[in-house]
């Protein structure tokens, strides 16, 4: 079986009539292939199914955050509802800032409400930078209740095609649970839009977790804009479409970091959006200005990822450290997995240190960056730092080779000895502005002006249904 995501998508969507996989509810027909596609490929790549909001831990977490700013939903009308997660917050000048939406909100004439999924982290309201914020819990809990009472059974038309796709991918998911989740999203958001003052626009991240919401918003005449949070390419299942599907549950606009993603979405993918738009990355401007000039390589930032890939990254670096004559200072930045969890598995030498600083601060104060296949591989370049990708199970190349393969400051390594040779060769680092300029196609400059142009372009936008 081919293991390239793009090839697998082509295989599935040319062989099967994926548009015919539907469910009927509320006197409407829903194309559910995108719902299944997002989850089955996620499980195939990462090894586990992504239905975090269905776990007992998640339900308890949402209940605890039920009153976190929730009054803000009811007491005023907003220009924008912006759906995000608390993982997007990083500490800047004493305040936890949402790196997707807080800065663009300052360029808008209207009010922004940040609606935050707080499964992973929760920050005190007094310590966040957002002017208006609400927990997403009220929506999630209402969906859970509705699903349990009214969606006990689901009917999927052409379910046999799902089984054929799962067989081809050698991976299966709980299709009924996925369908219930999205139907509950749709039904309850239609309810809340009758109760709450409606926004003029909805901004969100991770559209493939919000299909039910998107359809509800667009049916109510509210345009939806997705903001890029990670890699967008032919090897991301949520953005690579060959099949032509109805636009009703897809965002109208996708705001991206740079020209590579813009060209891919506008010219190659059949994802049924109206257009993509380049704005850049707000967090990059801030930290690039504060990044130290590159020196002889001594310190290395490491962007860890959750799950088995994080452990394999550490195993690789520990092996590298044992064989390297030079003992570099490694600054490890975990994502959600805790430092204590890693230390239960590994014994770290003195030159490996976990840091409490966010990944951008860490990169800007180190000489180079290493990761497996985190988006940080791209961002490090715009911060002026060389990017080294550990090609575990060929995933780094699957994700980044088409995007970064021609960049002279990007290096894929399969074995620890390769990294030793490269660092010896790269002992003299290039100036940070040289590395930054090499990445303009991936993260555009002029973030402020790009945001202002985007907001202006939305003024006459109608949702495509």
Walk through the language-model features, giving the residues of each.
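Catalytic-core helical/loop segments in enzymes performing group transfer/polymerization on anionic/lipid-linked
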Residues: 1-465
